[in-house]
Design a protein with these regions (language model features):
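Bacterial Sec-dependent N-terminal signal peptides
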Residues: 2-3, 8-11, 16-48, 139-148
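Post-signal-peptide N-terminal segment of Sec-exported extracytoplasmic proteins
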Residues: 43-92
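Active-site-proximal beta-strand/loop segments in catalytic clefts of secreted hydrolases
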Residues: 57-61, 99, 111-112, 129-133, ...
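Autoinhibitory propeptides
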Residues: 87-153
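Substrate-binding/specificity loop regions of serine endopeptidase catalytic domains
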Residues: 138-143, 233-234, 253-259, 278-350, ...
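Active-site core segment of subtilase-fold serine proteases
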Residues: 142-241, 258-261, 265-274, 327, ...
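Short, small-residue alpha-helix embedded
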Residues: 221-224, 374-389
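C-terminal subdomain of the subtilisin-like protease fold in secreted/lumenal serine endopeptidases
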Residues: 234-237, 244, 268-291, 298-300, ...
Length: 408
């Protein structure tokens, strides 16, 4: 079902880095646990297995074919199913975390080793994998820049938007789901719909969908759809509605189980033709890949960052996930040169896009970031308009098979 790919050289997760006008706060925040859990992510490194936390995939129950069920109804049904399975093994229902029924069928759960050994033999279970921390981090050898928040004196068209032939104003009904750290809903350059969004966090400073405590998701959203409004920057599909799906907290940290919950929400609520961007990733997860493939199979086009490890993208999830509606994106610079940090490999990579020194929106202003996290939303914006075209080849692709540069 999936493109084959190897594990990362080290369990680092990928995203963009700050190289421009703003530096984000990364203070420890222990007040934003994943729903149903009590995880303090600061205790873990990116890619670490979270002790005692698991993602259970169930054998098909047929719930996905019951089109009459709303997202809330599916959630209730799967929570009942999960609770009944746990009670069968005398496991407390409070151990049950996120539940999934719109993409994969299953749930997140806390288990002792003894409970894991017992429940894993149940015939209703297809697979169990360890939950992991997922966190944003810089490409190898890079680090965050410094500086204060900034605004642009007048509207600019970033070089990446020009390179992919974006910037036209979108007036249709398609929506862009940004599966990330949230989006600053007050930003004057973005058309944000929080009422359609999802938040994996239920308390602390990350519980509000109106804010983005990290800034990464707001930057991604601006590349997709910043308005043509005489200020700031212009996105690839200017003015498109961007929807926050907050699965990363203010430190840029979350869990695989929370990311799957976000994907599950989008699968249940998006319309065929909508798009989604996932500028995040980590070690291989069959459950995460399966959820993303299910989302793509519903008609939602998904842009995925290839990763920043200078590694084969086949070693990472969800970058390795394969479907006709999935586009895995590597990064180039303003001279079309393949970025030194970018992951590579065909498959899974479908296109390259600008990902070095990308100016976009951040809470309170604008900043330049680098990473495949910045390349992916260029293609996400293109997918609003249709399938990307061929704008030439990336220069110096290390796999010897140059990635096509995506354009409208």
């Amino acid at each position: 079902m999936f493109k084959q790919k190897p594990l990362w050289r080290k369990p680092a997760l990928f995203a963009g880095i700050i190289i421009g006008a703003v530096a984000f706060s990364c203070q420890q925040n222990t007040e934003s646990p994943i729903t149903g859990d009590s995880i303090e992510f600061v205790k873990f490194q990116s890619g670490d297995i979270i002790p005692g936390k698991y993602i259970v995939t169930l054998m098909p129950t047929g719930i996905n074919f019951r089109k009459d069920l709303s997202y809330d109804a599916v959630q209730a049904t799967m929570r009942k199913t999960g609770s009944e399975l746990l009670s069968k093994y005398r496991i407390d229902q409070e151990n049950l975390g996120f539940v999934y029924g719109s993409s994969i069928e299953g749930f997140a759960v806390s288990l002792t080793e003894e409970q894991y050994q017992a429940i894993s033999k149940d015939p209703s279970i297809k697979a169990i994998e360890a939950d992991r921390v997922i966190a944003l981090g810089p490409p190898p050898g890079k680090g965050p820049g410094s500086g204060g928040g900034g605004s642009t004196a007048s509207q600019q068209i970033p070089y990446g938007i020009e390179r992919v032939h974006g910037g036209a104003t979108y007036t249709g009904s398609k929506k862009a789901y940004i599966i990330d750290s949230g989006i600053d809903s007050s930003h004057e350059d973005l058309n944000v719909s929080t009422s359609l969004g999802f938040n994996a966090f239920t308390k602390g400073k990350d519980a509000s969908l109106d804010s983005d405590g990290n800034g990464h998701g707001t930057h991604v959203a601006g590349t997709v759809g910043a308005k043509d409004n005489s200020v700031g920057v212009i996105g690839v599909a200017a003015g498109v509605t961007v929807i926050p799906v907050k699965v990363l907290d203010s430190r840029g940290s979350g869990s695989y189980s929370g990311v799957i919950a976000g994907v599950d929400f989008v699968k249940a609520n998006a319309t065929s033709g909508d798009v989604a961007n996932m500028s995040l990733g980590g070690p291989i997860s069959d459950a995460l890949d399966a959820a993303v493939v299910s989302l793509a199979a519903s008609g939602v086009k998904v842009a995925l960052a290839a990763g920043n490890e200078s590694d084969n993208a086949n070693n990472h999830s969800p970058a390795r996930a394969n479907h006709a509606n999935i586009y895995t994106i590597s990064a180039i610079d303003s001279s079309d040169k393949f970025a030194s940090f970018s992951n590579y490999g065909n498959p899974p990579i479908d296109f390259a896009a600008p990902g070095v020194g990308i100016l976009s929106t951040v809470p309170g202003g604008y900043a330049s970031y680098s990473g495949t996290s910045m390349a992916s939303p260029h293609v996400c914006g293109l997918l609003i308009w249709g399938n990307p075209g061929n704008g030439g080849n990336a220069i110096g692709d290390p796999d010897g098979n140059p990635d096509q540069i995506a354009i409208r």
